[in-house]
């Protein structure tokens, strides 16, 4: 457990985004051929499209994936914590997020100031979410992963990974 949870404690993901949990599902994520590992740096331009998120688990089990930025609009003043970037529900175990249903459309990282953390949190669902049972959040700023999970009775996360991103310098022409 420690090798999975320690980077999340050091990165302040546990505490600021999720509570302490025991990982029970394997989750991998990649932007193109770049694997995401806890704390790695991903350029915003490399993350314009959703990452490929693969999960283990039994095919009959269903999962919810949430991606947020707890550092919006800036790490020194995260007044929009957490900014919601993506929600996918009803992901069958043993597949990837593209097999689920996108509840909130993916929005790539767009950090303006400082280094931002982007957190992918996976929850096991108790049952399939049917059309109309889930209402998308009214707004992306000030989303609360814990509150969403509690409201939908998702319990503690089954897997979490986070990466960092910062604003890319503008190309200068001379």
Swiss-Prot record:
InterPro entries: PEBP (IPR008914), PEBP-like_sf (IPR036610), PEBP_euk (IPR035810), Phosphatidylethanolamine-bd_CS (IPR001858)
Induction field: Induced by abscisic acid (ABA).
One of the Pfam families matching this protein, by short name: PBP
Homology family: Belongs to the phosphatidylethanolamine-binding protein family.
Function statement: May form complexes with phosphorylated ligands by interfering with kinases and their effectors.
PANTHER family: PHOSPHATIDYLETHANOLAMINE-BINDING PROTEIN, PROTEIN MOTHER OF FT AND TFL1 HOMOLOG 2
Name the record gives this protein: Protein MOTHER of FT and TFL1 homolog 2
Annotated gene: MFT2
């Amino acid at each position: 457990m420690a090798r999975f949870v320690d980077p999340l404690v050091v990165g302040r993901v546990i505490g600021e985004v999720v509570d302490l949990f025991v990982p029970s599902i394997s989750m991998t994520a990649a932007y193109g051929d770049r694997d995401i590992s806890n704390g790695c740096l991903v350029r915003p331009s490399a993350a314009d499209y959703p990452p490929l998120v693969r999960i283990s688990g039994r095919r009959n089990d269903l999962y919810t994936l949430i991606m947020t930025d707890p550092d919006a609009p800036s790490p020194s003043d995260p007044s929009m914590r957490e900014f919601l970037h993506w929600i996918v529900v009803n992901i069958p175990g043993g597949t990837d997020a593209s097999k689920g249903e996108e509840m909130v459309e993916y929005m790539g990282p767009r950090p303006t100031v400082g280094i931002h953390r982007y957190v992918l949190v996976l929850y096991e669902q108790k049952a399939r979410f049917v059309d109309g049972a889930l209402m998308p959040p009214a707004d992306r700023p000030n989303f609360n992963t814990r509150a969403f999970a509690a409201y939908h009775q998702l319990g503690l996360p089954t897997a979490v990974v986070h990466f960092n991103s910062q604003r890319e310098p503008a190309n200068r022409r001379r």
